[in-house]
Amino acid sequence: RIRYKGIVCDRCGVEVTSSKVRRERMGHIELAAPVTHIWYFKGIPSRMGLILDMSPRSLEEIIYFASYVVINPGNTPLEKKQLITEAEYRQYQDQYGTDTFDAKMGAEAIKELLAEVDLEKHAKELKNELKDATGQKRTRAVRRLDIVEAFIQSGNKPEWMVMDVVPVIPPDLRPMVQLEGGRFATSDLNDLYRRVINRNNRLKRLLDLNAPGIIVQNEKRMLQEAVDALIDNGRRGRPVSGPGNRPLKSLSHLLKGKQGRFRQNLLGKRVDYSGRSVIDVGPFLKMNQMGLPRQMAVELFKPFIYNRLIELGTENGGANNLRSARRLVERHEDVVQDVLEEVVKEHPVLLNRAPTLHRLGIQAFEPVLVSGKAMRLHPLVTTAYNADFDGDQMAIHVPLSDEAQAEARLLMLAASHILAPKDGKPIVAPSQDMTIGNYYLTTEEAGIKGEGMIFSSADEVKMALQNHEVELHTRIGIAASSFDKAKPFTDHQRARIMVTTVGKVIFNEILPDDFPYINEPKSENFNGIDGRFFLDPGTDIVGWFKNESLNGPFKSGFLSDIIAQIYARYQVTRTSVLLDDMKDLGYNISTRSGLTVRMSDVTELPEKGEVLKEAHEKVAKITKQFRRGLLTDDERYIQVTQTWSDAQDKIKSMLIASFDSKNPIFMMSDSGARGNISNSFQLAGMRGLMAAPNGKVIELPVTANFREGLCVLEMFISTHGARKGMTDTALKTANSGYLTRRLVDVAQEVIVREEDCGTDRGLDVSAIMDGNEVIEPLYDRILGRYAMKPVIDPKTGEVIAKKNQMIDEHVADQIIDAGIQTVTIRSIFTCRTEHGVCVKCYGRNMATGDIVEVGEAVGTVAAQSIGEPGTQLTMRTFHTGGVALSEDITQGLPRVQEIFEARNPKGRAEISEVTGKVTSIEENPADRTKTVTIEGETDTREYVLPISARLRVAEGDEIHRSEAINEGPLDPKELIKVSSTLKTENYMLAEVRKVYRMQGVGIA
């Protein structure tokens, strides 16, 4: 029994009860005049408009007291729902008398009209109308029928869209807090409610006073606007603003968007047992470890520490109860640190870095306690997180239950995320220092200390290195028999001497015993070492070296290939061991290499002046021709920019030729550790042509490089590009994130539902081309997919792949070697599984390299894989200065959005609707168009194109239905009308692939 139940405070008349009711008891405001609900009137499509069959504009005039609406025409020539102005209303009253017809304004009028709607009858009429309606009329009828049937089903009445009462949310949900200095901070809702109450009370008073109609009308309109602002401020007219001209947040804003109730508080909550800190590199960590600062660990694992302290009991330095355990922790007793070590062991934690663009943005690690306040991250997982150590922060979460810990350990450990879900290539690969270390280690040099020495074992080689008898780059011989029995050497090879370098012997020690010895950076080496590297005992090895050219060092791409090979052959555990070894070796050797950069490493090009002189002379010639009127301004511009661009390329090739292979800057860019040729080119060559803010190329190039220094004008020209770079990055991130969200939204239901859908349709795939350039080779398209039909070698007639067999690397190689150009594979496009896809149509799971499992959320993975590289795509819509391509080419992210949204692309190509012959092409200079006539078997079509369109056909050419007449992107909506769904899907697929490949991003 509650003691104070039903007692009311005698001072202020408030019921005495628990404070919880402040969150649940609602109030209401009884309105003196009905008010329409803005969601139903202003929402798109307007629900009121559809029910009443009136335009939103007419409704607005009625609701906000601009026009009268006829409710009952009586025996006058007026029509029901006709709008009349104030003046017309007076005139009709004088003409027909005041009682003959009924017209009203405001929400009352709407309410009466809605109350008269007979839903059942309405639905019948609309169904009859649908039988013979077409086009716009039909669309509108369908929409109206949807709304009417929804009303019938829900049992709501249309007139309820007009409110007589406004509910008031509980006071704790719109709090008011006292600040120091006696002022109050309050929720915006209180202001909005106050406006409604004030206007409502004023209206009541005016009605009691029998005030003139126009004043009452004005007050009713103001009440309507106040309620609108309360429900959805800013939806109609200017938003009501509070202090500092800030629009007030209405009820709708509390729910809407990223900061709204749903996304902020229901889908994303702040959780306990989490923290965030700056990250720092932890080269001492193993692949599945992270360094956790002790301070954070004590806080994160508190309940576990308390539990363990109580288990220990006081006799072992622990505690008897929670209170004393808490005291021990607060006092930082030594026993707490010992317990912490125990608790943390084998308890995985999750690390997340925002923005989480793909599933590798959250991974599990085993914590290792470290001093300091920064969390330590393994250097190899930085790629997956897109993290660097310039002040990035990361969040950490502790899985509590046994199930959560098991899930983190089995599915999320960093060591098992070696391949990227987007293309199946290793995402953890050595970078920067580690790359340059392994590059330096595997470099060969001719004629240095100890060349031609022969050793009996790898240990002997390392001993000679320590004694400075040989160097890392020295070419030596080693007895092949000294290697492990498992090494795939033939008996003939084992009896001979293998030639290699000291560094490569050390590098090969980190590879598995039965993995081929890697001696040159070629993929053939993975199937066994080339026989030419084995010499008979007694051969003049020094003489052999003199005639043999040097093998290249292992660059970052090749290191990735090694990792992929190890993963394919030995699975996760061995790969993560290799990665750690590669990391340690890389750091060690790059430290020992003493690689530095100095000013004189930026080589100067003596020939540069000549090239620039030639270019200047050529530009002067072009300008002269323009002055004489031999060239148009556009032609002059194109030729000038082309001249400079050619000069740039010439200097670039000279620069590449002049680089010494020992030059540290060259080594950095060549190994793939940092920088690329265009960075070096700006340092030592010339900066080249720059773009103006409007995207047009400035025809005056920056001829200086950074080593010489830029003059003021050149520096100024360069700033455009820098500014564009910054703004682009900011815009790109937002756009790319939004694209990912929309993609996930549509694709999240696509799940692998069954083993085999039994479809009999496949997809013919061949290499995707763009002109003569291969965008994606056939190998990449068939790898990991199932064959729909048997693949037969055209030369021998043997079956390479049976029907429904998965095409793995070995089979794919055979198909390519047989010279086959097109393969029919099973594809998601032709899968017949309902609400998802089947295993056979999907194929291999990129992230594991195994066949996909039933239940895998492949839709979400695909959406993330497209969205994640989105930030690397450019935002550019190219503006070509001249008329050469007068349409702007949309590229990068905007192009991807254009394809997915199936919008009308910019500068689109016309598609032929008939198969036939091009009979004539006529230019009409007057209206700047050209007309292409195509004569089909049954009818002739004419296509009018802009005069600048570049045609794909000439007179007399044959053209097929659904082929493009001119250059440019196709409109998917047009394409699907004249061809099949499959062809359209294929076109969109190839186009998206093209955009990503042009930016050097692979998605499979």
Swiss-Prot record:
E.C. numbers: 2.7.7.6
CDD domains tied to this protein: RNAP_beta'_N (cd01609)
Protein's GO biological process: DNA-templated transcription
Gene3D superfamilies, per database record: 1.10.132.30, 1.10.1790.20, 1.10.40.90, 2.40.40.20, 2.40.50.100, RNA polymerase II, clamp domain, RNA polymerase Rpb1, domain 3
Binding, Zn(2+): C757, C831, C838, C841
Cofactor note: Binds 1 Mg(2+) ion per subunit.
NCBIfam families reported for this sequence: rpoC_TIGR (TIGR02386)
Function: DNA-dependent RNA polymerase catalyzes the transcription of DNA into RNA using the four ribonucleoside triphosphates as substrates.
Protein name: DNA-directed RNA polymerase subunit beta'
Source taxonomy: Bacteria, Bacillati, Bacillota, Bacilli, Lactobacillales
Gene symbol of the encoding locus: rpoC
